[in-house]
Design a protein with these regions (language model features):
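Domain-scale macromolecular recognition modules
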Residues: 44-122
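Segments forming glycine/polar-rich beta-alpha architectures that bind adenosine-containing cofactors
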Residues: 4
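Short His/Asp/Glu-rich catalytic/ion-coordination signatures at enzyme active sites or charged loops
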Residues: 1
Length: 182
C-alpha cells in the first residue's frame, strides 16, 4: 500500500513538473488560460473565471520542414493531448524528449515517407520546446502516432507508447526561427 502511494506521488510530481514547465514557457495569456482550465479540471484549482469567454484557445506552434512537411508542436498538456490523440493520424511521426517535460511534436506525413532531415528537424524542435532546450545530446523518443495510447487515469498530455526509436540531439536554437511557418 505504501509502495502504491509512493508510485502515485511520483506520477503527480512528474505531471506537476510538466505544468510548471508549461507555465514558465507560456507565450501569452491564451496559453495560461488553457493551463488554468486544465488545473481546474484536475482539481488543483477550485475555481476559474475566464476574463474573456470569447477568447479562442492558442493554436499549436507551426513549422515547415526543409523537405516541405508541416511540423506541429503543442504549447501545453491539453494541446499535447489534442495534437497527439485527435489531430495526428496513424503514420504521422510523434516526438518527445525522453523522461523530461516538453511538448509533443508531430510531423504530419500526409501518407508520405518522412525523410531523415525532417526527422532530425522535428527532434530538434521537440528538444527546443522542452525543459532540456539547453542540453547536450538530449534523448528524444519518436514513433508513429498509431503506437501511442492513453489509458484511464493518466493526466492530460500523458501518453504511453511503444515501437519507438531514440535519437540523441544537441539543439540548435536558431532552427525554430528558420522553420517557423509564416
Amino acid at each position: 500500500m505504501l509502495v502504491d502511494l509512493l508510485a502515485e506521488g511520483e506520477k503527480e510530481i512528474a505531471y506537476l513538473e510538466t505544468v510548471l514547465y508549461e507555465v514558465e514557457s507560456a507565450p501569452g495569456e491564451a496559453a495560461l488560460n488553457e493551463i488554468r482550465a486544465e488545473l481546474k479540471g484536475q482539481g488543483y484549482l477550485k475555481y476559474y473565471k475566464p476574463r474573456d469567454k470569447k477568447q479562442k484557445p492558442a493554436d499549436f506552434y507551426r513549422y515547415l520542414s526543409s523537405d516541405g512537411f508541416e511540423i506541429l508542436v503543442g504549447r501545453n498538456n491539453l494541446q499535447n493531448e489534442r495534437l497527439t490523440l485527435h489531430t495526428a493520424r496513424g503514420r504521422d511521426l510523434w516526438f518527445h524528449t525522453k523522461n523530461a517535460p516538453g511538448s509533443h511534436t508531430v510531423v504530419m506525413s500526409g501518407g508520405r515517407d518522412i525523410p531523415d532531415r525532417t526527422r532530425e528537424e522535428a527532434a530538434q524542435l521537440a528538444v527546443l520546446h522542452s525543459s532540456q532546450a539547453k542540453g547536450v545530446k538530449v534523448a528524444v523518443d519518436y514513433t508513429e502516432v498509431k503506437n501511442i495510447r492513453k489509458t484511464a487515469g493518466l493526466k492530460p498530455g500523458m501518453v504511453l507508447y511503444d515501437k519507438y526509436e531514440t535519437a540523441y540531439i544537441t539543439p540548435d536554437p536558431t532552427l525554430a526561427e528558420k522553420l517557423k511557418k509564416k
